[in-house]
UniProtKB/Swiss-Prot annotation:
The lineage of its organism: Bacteria, Pseudomonadati, Chlorobiota, Chlorobiia, Chlorobiales. Signal peptide: none annotated. This is Small ribosomal subunit protein uS19. The keyword Lipoprotein does not apply. Keywords: Ribonucleoprotein, Ribosomal protein, RNA-binding, rRNA-binding. It comes from the Bacteria. GO terms for cellular component: cytoplasm; small ribosomal subunit. Protein S19 forms a complex with S13 that binds strongly to the 16S ribosomal RNA. Pfam families: Ribosomal_S19. GO terms for biological process: ribosomal small subunit assembly; translation. Belongs to the universal ribosomal protein uS19 family.
């Protein structure tokens, strides 16, 4: 379910204030954040935000296409290592029937 329009987007205030401060100074530093639920606003474009995935911070360079999405979408929390089971034979496919 989408967030109500009267509430507006959620952006962590400290994160937004840091980015606005850096925009005024003209700096570009990596900013660490644990706020995966913060929405990306146009002020973040061009900055690199290190988003926490539960273990480490993953650097995310914000582009114009990301505006309106949330930071958590770009820092996956789960690693896929393949399904369990026997390994396939070197031939690649099952033997052919006659």
């Amino acid at each position: 379910m989408a967030r109500s329009l009267k509430k507006g987007p959620f952006i962590q205030e400290r994160l937004l204030s840091r980015v606005l401060e850096m925009n005024q100074k003209g700096e570009k530093k990596v900013i660490k954040t644990w706020s995966r639920s913060s929405m990306i606003s146009p002020d973040f474009v061009g900055h690199t935000i290190a988003v926490h995935n539960g273990k480490t911070h993953i650097p995310v360079y914000v582009s114009e296409n990301m505006v309106g999405h949330k930071f958590g979408e770009f820092a996956p929390t789960r690693t896929y290592r393949g399904h369990a089971g026997g390994k396939a034979e070197k031939g690649g496919s099952a033997p052919k029937r006659k």
